[in-house]
Amino acid sequence: MVAFCAHSATLGLPTVLENVFRAQFASELPSFARHRTAIISRRPAYSRQFRSLSHNGFSLSQSISSSSSQSPATSQSQSKGNAHQSEVSIEDLTDNVTTSNSTSTPKDTPHTPPKASKTQKNSTGATEKNSRADNGLKATGPKPKRKKEGWQIQKDALKQKFREGWNPPKKLSPDALEGIRHLNAVAPDRFTTPVLAEQFRVSPEAIRRILKSKWRASEEELEDRRKRWERRHDRIWGHLSELGLRPKTKRTEPFADTNVLYDDRRKGSR
């Protein structure tokens, strides 16, 4: 029968782990003691919690010391239970410390000004709208009248003078004047003033003045007038022929605008 050796039992893996855990916990005990004294000086209410912690630590140290003489299986189970109890007690202690700090000494929160009520917001919005409306009225107010230019003054004067529009009097030829007098003398009932005005496209007042006029030109004046009207006719015909509206003729060729222009230049060069 094999005898049990106590020295060989201490060299097992569970025993080595117990010794390591005991050395680590022994090194952390001074820090726990300092933490306890600091908390007691600031918060006396935590003394009971630290007492329980010290009691648990003391019981844990006793259990570790007694576990060296026990069997490896029982010592390992007890060390695990004690370690779990110590961890639970430390977590409870830290939770209590944080809750007590949050309740007893509240943090300095920044002072926030009170929010404006809805009525104040509405009043401020109404004042802003009114100010904007006033600024808009000032900006879109009556602008100073600008001084009219010369062409604008002339245009207004023509509108007042010719309310029905610009309708210059038509210049009638001597033959047309003689024809008006002849028609009115032959059949005055048929060729009345409105009919003659519509036929010759002039105003009725112009027809009345032509019929009332008693002035008659002499033969020399009639001949001179006839020549002037022929030249006028040829000049207009030559202008229309250059535009392609009338055929060109030898009679109207000297009165064309091109010939008149180049003849003047030739005469000037000479």
Curated annotation (Swiss-Prot):
Keyword Cytoplasm on entry: no
Subcellular location per the Swiss-Prot or TrEMBL entry = Mitochondrion
- Which spans does this entry mark as compositional bias, Low complexity? 59-79
Q: List all Polar residues biased stretches.
A: 117-128
The record's annotation in Pfam families points to: Neugrin
Q: According to the UniProt record, where is the region Disordered? A: 59-152, 248-270
Q: Which GO terms describe its cellular component?
A: mitochondrion; nucleus
Q: Give UniProt keywords alphabetically.
A: Mitochondrion, Transit peptide
- Identify its protein family: Belongs to the RRG9 family.
Name the PANTHER family for this protein.
Answer: NEUGRIN (PTHR13475:SF3)
Function comment: Required for respiratory activity and maintenance and expression of the mitochondrial genome.
The molecule here is called Required for respiratory growth protein 9, mitochondrial
Query: What organism does the UniProt record list as the source?
Result: Aspergillus terreus (strain NIH 2624 / FGSC A1156)
